[in-house]
Curated annotation (Swiss-Prot):
N-acetylalanine: residues bearing it: A2
Domain of life: Eukaryota
Keywords of this entry: Acetylation, Chromatin regulator, Isopeptide bond, Nucleus, Repeat, Transcription, Transcription regulation, Ubl conjugation, WD repeat
Protein name: WD repeat-containing protein 5
Assembly and oligomerization: Interacts with PAXBP1; the interaction is direct and links a WDR5-containing histone methyltransferase complex to PAX7 and PAX3. Interacts with HCFC1. Component of the ATAC complex, a complex with histone acetyltransferase activity on histones H3 and H4. Component of the SET1 complex, at least composed of the catalytic subunit (SETD1A or SETD1B), WDR5, WDR82, RBBP5, ASH2L/ASH2, CXXC1/CFP1, HCFC1 and DPY30. Core component of several methyltransferase-containing complexes including MLL1/MLL, MLL2/3 (also named ASCOM complex) and MLL4/WBP7.
Marked site positions, Important for interaction with histone H3: D107, F133, F263, E322
Record-stated family: Belongs to the WD repeat WDR5/wds family.
PANTHER family the UniProt entry points to: WD REPEAT-CONTAINING PROTEIN 5, WD40 REPEAT PROTEIN
Cross-link (Glycyl lysine isopeptide (Lys-Gly) (interchain with G-Cter in SUMO2)): K7, K27, K46
Organism: Bos taurus
Subcellular location: Nucleus
GO annotation, biological process: transcription initiation-coupled chromatin remodeling
SUPFAM superfamilies cross-referenced by the UniProt entry: WD40 repeat-like
UniProt key word Repeat: yes
Length: 334
């Protein structure tokens, strides 16, 4: 059930229309976004673990420790359906590029591929020997990559459900896996303190990113253009890396992240921001270039474990743990 938020009159009056002269092709990043709470989505009965917008922008998928996936309208927060079948809690969910399929990663040691329109499980991917924690489709959506507490990364064939490769990737649980934009590379992160880049075709490790220190790496993803890698570590830090040079370019701090694997995002529909949840129950938004905190979103009553940015609109989805169990949709003018 989604509940709408009323906008105070004064706030609406402050939102002046932008003069048309500034409507150039490549807009400079505005000073600050103005994300405001629009909807609160309630339905999960345990901690929410992950939220992801469909690539076509229509839907939001959420996964939870309650073993369920829920689908919601991306623009109105309207509940659409529940997808069930896992025996234990789900840590992650991801969409195929055509927005027709979902893959989920569960503590029951399996991944499942779902047809979203029917809610049917098409394939169960078996092979990991411990909790499956993270998953993603490649852009072509013929492959799935998964990471597990068994310390391995696996590459799966979507059509057959067979495991094509098992990478002995890390020496501790794998916290995140992500393909770059042409699917040729995979980045993985782990509690062992490493970020590794893999050649998808051969399964070879091409690069290991190491900084001075090596706190557990709790999340990683490629930037939309594939040149950079955003990595979160459990010392309250997000870092932007130049992948080819193996150099850290930017550091984002001010949030709290010492315990949980919290998702982070590149927001590119308006200004260029970095977005992350936090253990102080807030959503943090940084200016990507200047590294300044430009907004903090207040409303959740527990750790904000997951955030997602809409593919075309200035919309953020956020989700929180056990004491909250809700998903919130926020919208900004820039």
């Amino acid at each position: 059930m989604a509940t709408g938020e009323k906008k105070p009159e004064t706030e609406a009056a402050r939102a002046q229309p932008t003069p048309s002269s500034s409507a150039t092709q490549s807009k400079p990043t505005p000073v600050k976004p103005n994300y405001a709470l629009k909807f609160t989505l309630a339905g999960h009965t345990k901690a929410v673990s992950s939220v992801k917008f469909s690539p076509n922008g229509e839907w939001l998928a959420s996964s939870s420790a309650d073993k369920l996936i829920k689908i919601w309208g991306a623009y109105d927060g309207k509940f659409e359906k529940t997808i069930s079948g896992h025996k234990l809690g789900i840590s992650d969910v991801a969409w195929s590029s055509d927005s027709n399929l979902l893959v989920s990663a569960s503590d029951d040691k399996t991944l499942k591929i779902w047809d979203v329109s029917s809610g049917k499980c098409l394939k169960t991917l078996k092979g990991h020997s411990n909790y499956v924690f993270c998953c993603n489709f490649n852009p072509q959506s013929n492959l799935i990559v998964s990471g597990s507490f068994d310390e391995s990364v696996r590459i799966w064939d979507v059509k057959t459900g067979k495991c094509l490769k098992t990478l002995p990737a890390h020496s501790d649980p794998v916290s995140a896996v992500h393909f770059n934009r042409d699917g040729s590379l995979i980045v993985s992160s782990s509690y062992d303190g490493l970020c590794r880049i893999w050649d998808t075709a051969s399964g070879q490790c091409l690069k290991t990113l190491i900084d001075d220190d090596n706190p557990p790496v709790s999340f990683v993803k490629f930037s939309p253009n594939g040149k950079y890698i955003l990595a979160a570590t459990l010392d309250n830090t997000l870092k932007l890396w130049d992948y080819s040079k193996g150099k850290c370019l930017k550091t984002y701090t001010g949030h709290k992240n010492e315990k949980y694997c919290i998702f982070a995002n590149f927001s590119v529909t308006g200004g260029k921001w970095i977005v992350s949840g936090s253990e102080d129950n807030l959503v943090y938004i940084w200016n990507l270039q200047t590294k300044e905190i430009v907004q903090k979103l207040q409303g959740h009553t527990d750790v904000v474990i997951s955030t997602a940015c809409h593919p075309t609109e200035n919309i953020i989805a956020s989700a929180a743990l056990e004491n909250d169990k809700t998903i919130k949709l926020w919208k900004s003018d820039c």
